[in-house]
Swiss-Prot record:
Listed name of the protein: Nitrite reductase (NADH) large subunit
Co-factor: note: Binds 1 siroheme per subunit. Binds 1 [2Fe-2S] cluster per subunit.
Pfam families assigned: Fer2_BFD (PF04324), NIR_SIR (PF01077), NIR_SIR_ferr (PF03460), Pyr_redox_2 (PF07992), Rubredoxin_C (PF18267)
CDD domains referenced in this protein's UniProt entry, alphabetically: NirB_Fer2_BFD-like_1 (cd19943), NirB_Fer2_BFD-like_2 (cd19944)
Associated pathway: Nitrogen metabolism; nitrate reduction (assimilation)
Lineage: Bacteria, Pseudomonadati, Pseudomonadota, Gammaproteobacteria, Enterobacterales
Organism name: Escherichia coli (strain K12)
GO cellular component: nitrite reductase complex [NAD(P)H]
Gene encoding the protein: nirB
Length: 847
């Protein structure tokens, strides 16, 4: 069977999604795929385009896994544009003079930004907000500018305004309509959004018709002149006034094009030529062009199914949207303007908290038609499902948007009421039925469901509903959703933390007597030991705490494969003096230890006998060192590059900040180990974005990333805050650390903790930055108290003779373990293998 020649014109988000869907459902060997990628880089995420200003690396936005196209034999023509299509011969001619033949053609040409016919709009320092190249040009211009304007007060316009504000520009938004986001919000919602945005320093000008832009000004380089006679001087202008389908190729080759633009498609996404499909913003279905990515993804799925002979149809798309604009949560659902005949409204307004909510319901009060949410979108998921699935409303619909008081909860739609066809994840078109099928296959955690179905791996907004579906299905199957720590405590780790803190419990025995049963086990003892340390930070080798410690904490060192231990003193930020180096060398030589520089920028000594540990540490402490907590569930290190102190590219003192942070948080017990990274510029030599906490210097301060991870399951850290000063950075870190300590499950790193946190990074931002839970003052106080209690555990041990008896090999003998054997290698030594070991006589012959 010959391969199907498949050509794809366009390598944007929808074009790439088509390829992914195709390869999910069919073998790449069945196709000969050629992709025209007009831009200088392969598919990237335009939805999160503004984040580019934070990390300045196109790779961060890339949608294509490394080696993906090569692995599947896909030919991608980067920087090459399709210029003509010969439908009779089924051949495409490119800007590079190439000819590509096809059996099936996918047109995913997207859209182009429309600029109103304003005189002067094509002059220097006038931009659009569409590609990475656009953002580079805007940022370059911003460096020599003070004042900028965004023409257009819709979704993308406000996103662009947020980017300009973050660049330090005096920002103005110019909107032709009398309100912002006129398509998604009603009048009151638009006014509330305007007030919130203006309170952040962005100037908003509505009902403004721009007549011309002239290259002159007293305080700036340009002057915008409006129809009402007013003027505004700015240095540069960003246009965000809508999009138009890119259908020129279709017109040239004779395909049907809609009167208002867009390549006409049927329910199978076929054009007027059955061998040519159109998907995404270039397509017109029933005279409608969809400017959001989710409908484009659905079109890609339909086109794939039709090519493979499966039944599927595009039936339109819901254009509801939830997003954060300039830090303001905004949501619009369904008939947000109440245009349905007989529609009635319920309105909630809290001026003190700047929250506005409106429900639009049917005349009989039984069906939700639409909603407007400004300032708080926590109800968005439930309200959207009510609209999409026409679920009957409760007796008092206003209860859906009124705040819950005195512990009373809001009425829930109940996931059982949702049909299996209900779309839970719009990013990947995952239905409730898809989730149930995955649960029946054994996916019994949110993380497992995400891996199996991709639900929640896009914008993350569906995670609360995914969790509800999971818990409901597990309950139906009789699988108890139990987060108890173990059989001895009917509480979760988080609940035990609060019991210990509130009741001032200081020992395992006291906690067991008050809230547990039995004698404890290998699960609860080390967990409670960690909790007690996280709450009170007492010396872990106190007699009442010693039985709770695992093997490493028991001896304040990591046990190795041969029964010896490693010794790793702290070197904050990777900094160490020549005297310190010589001291480590002398000690390693004296005790015959193997030495190595670790991946954490620390000097490690291996092969220490247990009974030598106190003396080794006594000498290290005398040389100015302290424990590095390499054995503990705590901060291990803050890895740094040399930063602006030495590097000609550095823009921030990464070493200085790394040293400060490592010393600030050292010795504080956390649910799992933590690693920090601090980079002095975006070249990222300390690999900060692969750490639990990553900090990168910018021209304006520091970018703070959290919940990254290396190891077996690498995870890129999420940006928590951008361009913040040192004081704000430390404040956010104090809160983040304590919130993690309070809420994470036992032995959970920050990466899976965030992945299982309902609301993900947006929720974490709301807690840490916006104080959503009203906890920040308490979190800062708890961190301050823990820091005051920090001690070097080895200093305490060396100064406590009774604590050193545990380091003897044998209770009744001063002899050492004869099974420890070393062999030489590369001028040092290592543990002997079983084949290299010399037999040991354990019983002496006294004859």
């Amino acid at each position: 069977m010959s391969k199907v020649r498949l050509a794809i014109i366009g390598n944007g988000m929808v074009g790439h999604r088509f390829i992914e869907d195709l390869l999910d459902k069919s073998d790449a060997a069945n196709f000969d795929i050629t992709v025209f990628c007009e831009e200088p880089r392969i598919a990237y995420d335009r939805v999160h385009l503004s984040s580019y200003f934070s990390h300045h690396t196109a790779e961060e936005l890339s949608l294509v896994r490394e080696g993906f196209y090569e692995k599947h034999g896909i030919k991608v023509l980067v920087g090459e544009r399709a210029i003509t299509i010969n439908r009779q011969e089924k051949v495409i001619h490119s800007s590079a003079g190439r000819t590509v033949f096809y059996d099936k053609l996918i047109m995913a040409t997207g859209s182009y930004p429309w600029i109103p016919p304003i005189k002067g709009s094509d002059t220097q320092d006038c931009f659009v907000y569409r590609t990475i190249e656009d953002l580079n040009a805007i940022e370059s211009c911003a460096r020599r500018s003070k004042r900028g304007a965004v023409v257009g007060g819709g979704l993308l316009g406000l996103e662009a305004a947020g980017a300009l504000k973050n660049l330090g520009i005096e920002t103005h938004v110019i909107e032709f309509a009398p309100m912002l986001m006129a398509e998604q919000l009603d009048q009151m919602g638009g006014e509330q959004l305007r007030r919130k945005i203006e309170s952040m320093g962005v100037r908003v000008h509505t009902s403004k018709n721009t007549l011309e832009i002239v290259q002159e000004g007293v305080e700036a380089r340009k002057t915008m002149r409006f129809a009402d006679g007013s003027e505004l001087e700015v240095d540069f202008i960003v246009f965000s006034t809508g999009i138009r389908p890119r259908d020129k190729l279709a017109t040239q080759c004779g395909l049907d094009v809609a009167p208002r633009g867009g390549i006409v498609i049927n329910d199978s996404c076929q054009t007027s030529d059955p061998d040519i499909y159109a998907i995404g913003e270039c397509a017109s279905w029933n005279n409608r062009v969809f400017g959001l990515v989710a409908p484009g993804y659905k079109m890609a799925q339909v086109a794939v199914d039709h090519i493979l002979g499966s039944e599927n149809a595009f039936e339109g798309a819901d254009l509801s949207a939830k997003l954060k604009l300039l830090g303001v949560d905004v949501g619009g659902i369904g008939d947000a303007h109440g245009r349905t005949p007989g529609a009635r409204s319920y309105v909630y307004l809290d001026e003190s908290k700047e929250i506005y909510k409106r429900l639009i319901v049917s005349e009989d009060n039984k069906t939700l038609l639409g909603a407007v949410l400004v300032g708080d979108t926590s109800d968005y998921g439930n309200l959207l499902q009510l609209v999409l699935n026409a679920i009957e409303l409760p007796e008092n619909p206003d209860s859906l948007i009124l705040p819950a008081h005195s512990g009373s909860g809001k009425p829930s739609i109940g996931v059982d009421k949702l049909p299996d066809s209900a779309q839970i994840c719009s990013c990947f078109d995952v239905t409730k039925g898809d989730l149930i099928a995955a649960i029946n296959k054994g996916c019994h955690t949110v993380a497992a469901l995400k891996a199996e179905t991709k639900a929640g791996t896009g914008c993350g907004g569906c995670i609360p509903l995914v969790t509800q579906v999971l818990n409901a299905e597990l309950a139906k199957q009789g699988i108890e959703v139990n987060n108890n720590l173990c059989e001895h405590f009917a509480y979760s780790r988080q609940e035990l933390f609060h019991l210990i803190r509130v009741e001032g419990i200081k020992t395992f025995e006291e906690l067991l007597a008050k809230h547990g049963k039995g004698y404890g086990c290998e699960v609860c003892k080390p967990t409670v030991g960690s909790l007690l340390a996280s709450c009170w930070n007492e010396y872990i080798l106190k007699p009442e705490h010693t039985p709770l410690q695992d093997s490493n904490d028991n001896f304040l060192a990591n046990i190795q494969k041969d029964g010896t231990y490693s010794v790793i003193p702290r070197s904050p930020g990777g900094e160490i003096t020549p005297e310190g180096l010589m001291a480590v060398g002398r000690i390693a030589r004296e005790f015959n230890l193997y030495t190595k520089i670790t991946g954490s920028q620390r000097l490690a000594m291996f092969g220490a006998q247990k009974d030598d540990l106190p003396e080794i540490w006594r000498q290290l402490i005398e040389a100015g060192f302290e424990t590095g907590h390499a054995y503990a569930k705590a901060l291990r290190m803050a890895k740094t590059c040399v930063g602006s102190t030495w590097c000609r590219y550095g823009v921030g003192d990464s070493v200085g900040l790394g040293v400060e942070l490592e010393n600030r948080y050292k010795g504080i017990r956390t649910p799992h180990k933590m690693k920090f990274g601090v980079s002095g510029c975006t070249r990222e030599c300390s690999e900060a974005q692969g750490k639990d906490v990553g900090i990168i210097a910018t021209e304006k301060g520091w970018n703070l990333y959290v919940c990254g991870n290396g190891g077996m399951k690498p995870r890129h850290a999420d940006l928590l805050a951008a361009d913040i000063d040192r004081e704000t950075l430390i404040k956010y870190l104090d809160r983040f650390m304590m919130f993690y300590i309070r809420t994470a499950d036992k032995l959970t790193r920050t990466a899976p903790w965030l992945e299982n946190l309902e609301g993900g990074i947006d929720y974490l931002k709301a807690v840490i930055i916006d104080d959503k839970l009203g906890l920040n003052a308490h979190l800062e106080e708890e961190m301050a108290r823990l820091r005051e209690a920090v001690l070097c555990e080895w200093t305490e041990t060396v100064n406590t003779p009774s604590a050193q008896t545990r380091f003897k090999h044998f209770i009744n003998s001063d002899k050492r373990d004869p099974n420890v054997q070393m062999v030489p290698e590369r001028e040092q030594h290592r543990p002997a293998t079983p084949y290299e070991r010399i037999p040991v006589t354990l019983v002496e012959d006294n004859a």
